[in-house]
A protein has these predicted regions:
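Short, basic alpha-helical nucleic acid-contact segments in DNA-binding proteins
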Residues: 1-13, 115, 279-283
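Compositionally biased amphipathic helical and low-complexity segments enriched in hydrophobic
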Residues: 2-4, 13, 21-23, 72, ...
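Two-metal-ion RNase H-like nuclease active-site motif
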Residues: 5-29, 36
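Acidic/histidine-rich catalytic cores and adjacent linkers
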Residues: 30-42, 50, 60-98, 102-106, ...
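Short alpha-helix plus adjacent loop in nuclease-associated cores
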Residues: 104-125
C-alpha cells in the first residue's frame, strides 16, 4: 500500500484493484464546488477532486493512464452520469461498467410520482380521488407495507377498508396511474429477483412494455433504459457474493456529510478537504 499525493488530494492507492465505485458529494463553498470522489477496491481508496466535470476527470486520470493498475479494474459502478461512463470507457479498458440499481429505481419512482401528481391535479381538492392520491400516496411506493392488514374504519369513505382496498381504489382513479404502477412493480421485481442471465433475457421485454404503455412521464426513464442498457444488465453480475452496487459508497457519503458539518469552522478549503480525507483513511474501510 502506498500513500500518494496528487493535486491537493491525499488517498490510499492499492495495487490490486478489482472494483471501482464512482459517486460524489457536493458542497457549495464561497470559492468553488467541493467534490469528494470515492473509489472502493478491497480496502477503500478515498480521494478528493475539486470537480467532476469530464474535462477535469480527463486531466486527473491522465496522470494514471500509463499505470498497469487501471487494467486490473474489472468493474466500475456509477450513477447515470454520462461523463463517468465516457471516462471509464477511455481509461478502464478491461472493466465492465455497471449502473447502481438504486439510482435507477429512484428514477423510476420519481417518474411514477409525476404521474400521480398529474392525475391529482385533475381533481378538486375536496374530492375523494384527491384525498386518496394525497393521503395514501405511500401505498404506491412503499413495498414494505403489509397490504392485507386488518381493515379499519375510514371516516372519509364511510366504511372499513384495509391497505390493499385503498390501493385498488387509487389505481381505479386513472388508467395511466394503474399502468404506471404495474410497470413500476414489474421492474422492481425484475431488479430484485433476476440473475445476470435472466436480466439479459428479459430486459428488452420490460423495456418494450414501458414503450408500449405510452405514459409521457416515463419518457426520461425509457431513455435511460435505452442509453444505459448494457450497464444496467451488467449490474446483475454477482461479485464476492453480492450484486455490484455502490451502497457502501453511498453509506460513506453519510459519514463524509457529517465530517463536512463538523468542519464548518475551517475556512481554508484545501485544509478542510485534507482533514476529511485523513479522518476517513485513518480508520480504514473493508468491503465485507
Amino acid at each position: 500500500m502506498t500513500l500518494v499525493y496528487i493535486e491537493g488530494g491525499i488517498f490510499l492507492w492499492i495495487t490490486m484493484i478489482s472494483f471501482l465505485s464512482l459517486c460524489s458529494i457536493w458542497v457549495m463553498t464561497l470559492l468553488n464546488l467541493f467534490t469528494l470522489l470515492l473509489m472502493s477496491p478491497i480496502i477503500f481508496l478515498f480521494l478528493s477532486l475539486p470537480d467532476r466535470k469530464k474535462g477535469y476527470l480527463h486531466h486527473y486520470f491522465q496522470h494514471l493512464q500509463d499505470s498497469s493498475e487501471l487494467l486490473n479494474v474489472k468493474y466500475v459502478c456509477m450513477d447515470m452520469y454520462l461523463p463517468y461512463k465516457q471516462i471509464s470507457k477511455h481509461y478502464f479498458k478491461k472493466a465492465l461498467i455497471c449502473v447502481d440499481s438504486f439510482h435507477l429505481i429512484k428514477h423510476l419512482n420519481e417518474s411514477l410520482q409525476k404521474v400521480r401528481i398529474r392525475v391529482l391535479r385533475s381533481y378538486d381538492t375536496d374530492s375523494i380521488q384527491y384525498y386518496l392520491l394525497k393521503k395514501w400516496k405511500c401505498l404506491l411506493f412503499d413495498r414494505t407495507i403489509e397490504l392485507d392488514n386488518k381493515g379499519k374504519f375510514n371516516k372519509r369513505l364511510g366504511r372499513y377498508v384495509n391497505y390493499r382496498q385503498l390501493l385498488e381504489l387509487i389505481l381505479a382513479i386513472h388508467p395511466d396511474l394503474k399502468s404506471a404502477y404495474e410497470l413500476k412493480e414489474k421492474y422492481t421485481i425484475f431488479n430484485a429477483t433476476s440473475s445476470y442471465e435472466e436480466a439479459k433475457q428479459n430486459f428488452d421485454v420490460i423495456y418494450h412494455d414501458f414503450i408500449n404503455a405510452h405514459i409521457p412521464e416515463y419518457c426520461d426513464f425509457i431513455t435511460s433504459l435505452s442509453n444505459w442498457r448494457d450497464e444496467i444488465i451488467n449490474s446483475f453480475i454477482v461479485y464476492r457474493g453480492k450484486r455490484i452496487n455502490s451502497s457502501v459508497a453511498e453509506s460513506m457519503n453519510a459519514i463524509v456529510s457529517t465530517l463536512l458539518f463538523n468542519t464548518k469552522g475551517i475556512r481554508n478549503i484545501e485544509r478542510r478537504r485534507k482533514r476529511i480525507i485523513y479522518a476517513v483513511n485513518k480508520t480504514g474501510f473493508l468491503i465485507k
